[in-house]
């Protein structure tokens, strides 16, 4: 991922609050993301049809899936999403391209089978849409506002006690041999 061209979002929610059907769940969890695109003036929606993967190591180049991939009017992917489900929770992570930089995405790989041109044919940036404010931080603010409104959340910050507790959990979990060797959570 590109540190400045990409924007990431994550939603963690009670599984019982959302549809059991994965596609329906994606549609509901992506409502605030689509609202942010709309607020920015970007014409973005779910892909109408799938497309084969161009190259698996890069998430933007994996197969285009109408269940969870968002595209611009030209059909290029602007956002991809993935879900992880436990017995009690749904964790959804999304990556969206605000400003596409094919060279930056491909740079970490030695001799990728896809060049910048093929990347640009599959992936588009939100900022490329006519009428969209090219200010990334303004878009991030719109996305944050849409997520807060959708979730009925209150903006806030971590307390010192919460940060200390999180650090303790990280230390206990990730320093444990049973986690490192077998992904057995000791917490």
Feature names for model-found ranges:
Residues 1, 22, 93-96:
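Hydrophobic alpha-helical segments that drive targeting, anchoring, or assembly
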Residues 2-6, 65, 91:
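Short connector loops at helix/strand junctions that flank enzyme active sites
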Residues 16-24, 128-134:
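Flexible, glycine/proline-enriched loop segments at strand-loop-helix junctions
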Residues 1-20:
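A glycine-rich, hydrophobic loop/mini-helix early in the fold
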Residues 23-39:
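Long, well-ordered alpha-helical scaffolding segments within enzyme catalytic domains
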Residues 34-54, 86-187:
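Long, positively charged amphipathic alpha-helical accessory segments at protein N-termini or as interdomain linkers
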Residues 14-16, 74-75, 100-102:
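Short loop segments at secondary-structure junctions
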Residues 60-87, 93:
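Aromatic/basic-lined ligand-recognition segments
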């Amino acid at each position: 991922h590109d540190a400045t061209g990409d924007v990431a979002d994550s939603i963690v929610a009670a599984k019982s609050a959302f549809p059991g059907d994965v596609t329906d769940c994606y549609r509901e969890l992506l409502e605030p993301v689509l609202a942010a695109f709309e607020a920015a003036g970007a014409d973005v929606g779910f892909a109408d049809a799938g497309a084969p993967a161009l190259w698996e190591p890069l998430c933007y180049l994996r197969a285009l899936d109408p269940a969870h991939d968002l595209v611009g009017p030209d059909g290029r992917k602007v956002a991809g999403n993935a879900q992880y489900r436990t017995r009690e929770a749904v964790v959804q992570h999304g990556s969206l391209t605000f400003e596409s930089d094919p060279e930056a995405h491909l740079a970490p790989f030695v001799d990728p089978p896809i060049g910048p041109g093929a990347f640009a044919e599959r992936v588009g940036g939100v900022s490329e849409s006519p009428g969209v404010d090219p200010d990334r931080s303004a878009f991030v603010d719109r996305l944050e506002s849409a997520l807060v409104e959708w979730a009925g959340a209150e903006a806030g910050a971590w307390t010192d006690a919460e940060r200390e507790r999180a650090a303790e959990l990280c230390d206990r979990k990730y320093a444990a041999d049973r986690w490192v060797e077998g992904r057995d959570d000791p917490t």
